[in-house]
Each structure stands twice: as C-alpha cells, then as structure tokens.
Amino acid sequence: ANYLGRAAKEIFEVNGNVVYGFLDDNKSLHNKELDETFILGSTDDDGFLKLIGKKCEAFIAVDDNRLRKNLVNMLHEVRHVQPVNAVHSNALIAKHVELGHGNFIDQGVKVGVGVKIGNHCLLQAGCIIGAEVSISDFVQIGSGSIISSGVTIEEEAFIGAGVTVVSGITIGKGARIGAGSVVVAPVKAGETVFGNPAQPIKS
C-alpha cells in the first residue's frame, strides 16, 4: 500500500480490472482504505494467498528488490503462480516485444521494436526504451530516462530519473546510475556512476 501500489491499482482499474484489495505487512494499515480499496492483511496471510491463481491474480508493488524477490519466490513456491504485468493503457509498446512477468510499465512509456524485458522490472512514467534493448530481471528505470537502441541492462540495475544512455553499451548487474546522468561508456557490475558524462563515484 505505497505509491507503487496506488499507481498499479490505477493501471488495473483503467484497464477494466477489479482490484479486490491490498496486502501490506504494516499491521497498523490493516482494515483501512486507500483510494477506496481496503488493505486486507499481510503478505503471508494464507487466507488471501490461497485465492491467488484460483479466484484472482496478484501484482507485487514493491520497489525494494530484496523484498520484491522474496515475495516473488513465495508466490512461486506457495501458489505456483507468477505476478501479472501492470501496463498503463497510455504506454506505447511495439508489436514485436518480449515481455516477462510482474513488470510495471507506467503512463507515457515507449518501448521500441525488438526490446526484451525480463521479469519484475519497473519502468517509470515517460521513459523511452529504444529498439533492440535488452532489460534483465528486477531492473528499475526512472521517469523520463532515455535508453538508446542496442543497450543491454543487466539484472538489478537501477537507472535514476532523467538519465540518458547512449546506444550499444552495457549497464552491469546491480549498477546504479544517478538521476540526470548521461552515460556514454559501459558501467561495470555493482558500480555507481553520476554526472555528464557519468563517472564512477568513489566510496
């Protein structure tokens, strides 16, 4: 029941789906309403979990990758299901795109032809993904970022708002790119970069 949950709920409702409720581990929120939808219980409440895959689908609205992974694994192991995608009706996605499970694609996102998007990625409002970009699992791309054609983004990379990544380079696993940066060279796995041009930040 956070900003991402509210945004996902809006997407599902605009697309004509019924949202039955939120699950949140903050017990102080239970039985309260958020945007006219009740917070029903915790994410480990079997009374609600047993409905997933039979009576309804689920989406994991969490931007913390560690928690997101834990919840994905729980759904897979306990319910043998994968979360659905939340794709805004105003997103423009090319016909020939590969899209995995559990992805959040917000309003104004543009995805070019030949793009491959893995599982459980977050593409925030207005970001542009050029042709033949490869995006691995659990990647986050901030609002207004431009990912040029042929870029490879490895698992768990984080790209802040308003970033520009030039064509053909690789963003390594777990790399972090600060907001507003212009990336003109490959970013190593686990590296944090910032600036124009983006440079590694020394710890």
Residue ranges and their predicted role:
Residues 14-33:
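NAD(P)-binding Rossmann-fold cofactor-contacting core
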Residues 20, 56-57, 101:
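Conserved acidic residues
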Residues 8-12, 75:
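Active-site catalytic pocket residues across diverse enzymes, especially alpha/beta-hydrolases
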Residues 1-8:
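Glycine-rich adenosine-cofactor-binding loop
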Residues 85-201:
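Structural signal for interior beta-strand "rungs" in well-ordered beta-sheet cores
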Residues 67-69, 199-202:
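Short, cationic motifs built from Arg/Lys/His that form the positively charged side of catalytic pockets
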Residues 27-92:
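Phosphate-bearing ligand-interacting subdomains
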